[in-house]
Amino acid sequence: MDFGFTEEDETFRTEAKRWLAAHATGVQDRRTWERTLGQAGWIGLGWPEPGYGNRTATLTQQVVWAEEYARSPAPPRSGHIGENLLAPTLIAHGTPEQKSRFLPPIAAGDELWCQGYSEPDAGSDLAGVRTTAVREPRGYRITGQKIWTSLAHEADWCFVLARTDPGARRHHGLSFLLVPMDQPGRVEVRPIRQMTGTSDFNEVFFDGAHARAEHVVGGEGNGWRVAMSLLGFERGVSTLAQQIGFAEELGRVVRTAVDTGAADDPVVRDRLVRQWAELRTMRWNALRTLGGVGDPGAPSVAKLLWAGWHQRLGELATRVRGAAAGAGPADWSPAAPYELDESQHLFLFSRADTIYGGSDQIQRTIIAERVLGLPREPKGDV
């Protein structure tokens, strides 16, 4: 594997660090921030096609940008779903008209996207979606419910997996549609209050929402193929940026262990060292995958490893705090949203890591069948 950083990469790193230092402090509005990123050409670095207002960059430069962004005080991205998921999908499956309509606004930070996949009865079993898209003279009428939809409350558009042929077998009657969210009375977004006290996810209800006929990606009935290719874009360069955040969380847990005296416990010290060693291993595995080394199951292995690692870190964070880990703020009241400290938020949010983005069970099935060559899992109607 050859994945070193060249002199040009380090020059690019210096440019990225200087720009972030000058612009990323004190950001208040995330939509404005997306436009700032777009104006500077930082959106769409990894797109395989230029010409949409995006700036092209090598793979190593994409890694540099992702890592420096993670180290900076810049806010979490609200345009990453459009940039990292929809855009590569349109480049792979979209028509020239779809690309020219949707890619420039994504690159400019002008349009934000959300993903309409999961439903109350179709999570890991994505082929079981019940949302329907009925053909009309000018497009499709969409009816159904999506759940766990990140950023739906901010998004301008949603890419929706819906059933266009109810009579077809499960994987063959689906289509991938681009749906505008600004349809009063036809699209309703309801935030989901989590046990962390925040509302990062939403329910989305489509009641006769309209999608134009030319906004079906990959053609009617080919939604499963398009949707699966999109999921392949979920784990890429962003994995390395994620690991920068993990390293910062681990550092805070180590400091807490020292401050509370928990680090005097040899069992705690052993667990801290194991977390550090495993994180380094995950980084090199990610670099190997990006460098083209590894088997087809590498993304599933990576997801399985980091999800378990992060959950164990959350458990360790509560252990080193002792009894204080269960204490809430002294001024909490039902009328005021409560605040969690970093270790509490880490523990609670990490419980979802083994579910979203493909559950551990799904990842193990992929590894078993595609890497180890074990017999396929028995299925019902396929």
What annotation goes with each model-predicted range?
Residues 28, 262-269, 280-335:
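C-terminal helix-coil-helix/basic helical segment that borders enzyme active sites and/or dimer interfaces
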